[in-house]
Amino acid sequence: MSPNFADLLLLVDSRLPAGGHAHSGGIAPAIEAGLIKDIDQLEIALRARLKHQGPMQAAAVRLAAKGLNPDEIDHALDIRMPSKAARAASRAQGRGLIRVADQVWPEIGFEVIDHHHPVAFGVIAKSFGASEVAPLAFLQQSLMSGASAGVRLMGFDPISVTFLVSQMRSIVEEVSQSITQIESIDEMPAGSLPGLESLTENYSKAQVRLFAS
């Protein structure tokens, strides 16, 4: 059976053995630094990630899913991501995703690549014929991964966190819509959160940590 939109849903499932559950997009480092102590502060951090980093990531997914050169998209992300630790985490997720996809859908024959997570996600989505919805799916996955850090590290009520994620769907849709006219790598937005990126650098050096990033 050919991959389709239903298969794309597997990519946003936290149970997918691609290592995504170990990454929080900077939320875990912020928690460890004492910057997130309640659900309201978690919401602020998640909103900031979506609004500042989301457009850049979603645009990369879109361009990769449209079939643009993944190496060039990958290089564009490198330039736009100042944190070495964040870049390493993104590439680790990308490798994990491609590795799983190659084993779950061997008939497609995914090329082994060492690309950022958004690029790998877009490449896979293209093979599923799900290019148009790929940015939205990626943003939703990113949101859920960050939110899960609040549950696992702070013991926040899972239902309350799920409610928070559902209330943020309008932001996910807004960011996804904001990049629908982007057709070239030069048009990719650049967005960073210096605070979270600095914390991610420090966090990557910690001897004991639940999340990789």
Predicted regions span which residues?
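Metal- and O2-centered redox machinery and metal/ROS homeostasis
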Residues: 1-213
